[in-house]
From Swiss-Prot:
It catalyses: ATP + protein L-histidine = ADP + protein N-phospho-L-histidine. This is Signal transduction histidine-protein kinase ArlS. The gene is arlS. Its main location: membrane. It is found in: Cell membrane. Autophosphorylated. It comes from Staphylococcus aureus (strain NCTC 8325 / PS 47). Gene3D superfamilies: 1.10.287.130, 6.10.340.10, Histidine kinase-like ATPase, C-terminal domain.
Length: 451
């Protein structure tokens, strides 16, 4: 399908609209002018016919001359006087061009008629004349040639005006459309440059049109988001590759040990197998968490949501954690009010354990963790507090980014891969919640989850 240029479409549409509008306007004006002019011609003919009638009432017929009749006639008029027996008595005109013979029985036509003769239209008015010494009638013949010429001139003027207005409109439309489409052409060229050279170029358009400037700003914002998404994707691949490379290198190294000495040394074989299994489990966990970050949406969650009793779930998880980590102190301050939320039960358990696991990893000295729930303004609030190393303020905006670690030198020894908080944040957001953090170095961290 052949596409037309926006500028050409604009010129064609505006020109056609202007031409049709002016043409219709001129037709309406001409219609009213024709009616006005025609009525004026009829009034002139009626006036002359009435003057002729008055002339016959003012003096005897024998005293009426052709000069008297001509004095009562206007331009382009002819008068014929008949007696009661249809005998022609007078015929005179002020204009030699008016010479028309009605050519039919005058007695039977209406008072006012139109008749075309040799290409010219005439008004014919029949007026009865009855005086003391005369009885008959007059035929006033009024030529409409001048009227027709004026109407033709009006049509020509209207057409010329329409053509001139159309040309002017087309010229203005061309200039205006060029000014409008010029930024769009620049926008298209910039897009091509960005596609060729990358995200480093941004649109720099300063026009007099708010819409074009808004379009350019929106495009720049969109490109910034795409660039950010691209960088995140690239960083994600790099981080994932790095996270997978380390355990794979460890496994490869121990397999080489087994190949060299493990066949003969059971201790080396046992140690290498245990480490390889541990690193393999780390890889499996990393892959599972990566999959968790890339699946699920709001519709799926809402369709499988169940009522989760927050306090009951926390008590159950804390009981298990006390058995698993007997060296840690778990304190709870749970509200007496019933806290319920609609979500997948395993997701609540998952996000709760992520925060508890995070607290355990970074509170190896005091080993004291507190969980608190409360209801405020219909908001269900869960607070998890540890007394560990804390999070620097400059890192707090990034801790939910994938693979981000506050202390990169300690994270691997603590078993973290920087995905847990990202997963927790995603679960909270998909269920309509939010999360806040409050932390001080060497004093601890509090995560506040709000539903």
């Amino acid at each position: 399908m052949t596409k037309r240029k926006l500028r050409n479409n604009w010129i064609i549409v505006t020109t056609m609209i202007t031409f049709v509008t002016i043409f219709l306007f001129c037709l309406i004006i001409i219609f009213f002018l024709k009616d006005t002019l025609h009525n004026s011609e009829l009034d002139d003919a009626e006036r002359s016919s009435s003057d002729i009638n008055n002339l016959f009432h003012s003096k005897p017929v024998k005293d009426i001359s052709a000069l008297d009749l001509n004095a009562s006639l206007g331009n382009f008029q002819e008068i014929i006087i008949y007696d009661e027996h249809n005998n022609k008595l007078f015929e005179t005109s002020n204009d030699n061009t008016v010479r028309v013979e009605p050519g039919y029985e005058h007695r039977y036509f209406d008072r006012v008629i139109k008749k075309r003769y040799k290409g010219i239209e005439y008004l014919i008015i029949k007026e009865p004349i009855t005086t003391q010494d005369f009885k008959g009638y007059s035929l006033l013949i009024h030529s409409l040639e001048n009227y027709d010429n004026i109407v033709k001139s009006l049509y020509i003027i209207a057409l010329a005006f329409g053509v001139i207005a159309t040309i002017i409109t087309a010229t203005i439309s061309y200039v205006f459309s060029t000014q409008i489409t010029k930024p769009l052409v620049s926008l298209s060229n910039k897009m091509i440059e960005i596609r060729r050279d990358g995200f480093q170029n941004k649109l720099q358009l300063n026009t007099n049109y708010e819409e074009i400037d808004n379009l350019a700003n929106t495009f720049n914002e969109m490109m910034s988001q795409i660039e950010e998404s691209f960088n995140q994707q690239r960083q994600f691949v790099e981080d994932a590759s790095h996270e997978l490379r380390t355990p794979l290198q460890i496994i490869q190294g121990h397999l080489n040990l087994i190949q060299r000495w493990g066949k003969k040394d059971p201790a080396v074989l046992e140690e290498s197998l245990n480490i390889s299994i541990e690193e393999m489990n780390r890889i499996i966990k990393l892959v599972e968490e990566l999959l968790e970050l890339t699946k699920g949406d709001v519709n799926d969650i809402s369709s499988e949501a169940q009522t989760v009793h927050i306090n009951d779930e926390i008590r159950s998880r804390i009981h298990s954690l006390k058995q698993l980590h007997p060296d840690y102190q778990f304190d709870t301050d749970l509200t007496s009010k019933n806290l319920e939320i609609k979500m997948k039960p395993h997701q609540f358990e998952q996000l709760f354990l992520i925060f508890i696991d995070n607290a355990i990893k970074y509170d190896v000295k005091n080993k004291k963790i507190k969980v608190k729930t409360r209801l405020k303004n219909k908001q269900k609030i869960i607070e998890i507090t540890d007394h560990g190393i804390g999070i620097p303020e400059e890192d707090q905006d990034f801790i939910f980014d994938r693979f981000y670690r506050v202390d990169k030198s300690r994270s691997r020894s603590q078993g973290g891969n920087g995905l847990g908080l990202s997963i927790a944040q995603k679960i909270i957001q998909l269920n309509g919640g939010s999360i806040k953090i409050k932390s001080e170095i060497n004093k601890g961290t509090t995560f506040k989850i709000i539903f």
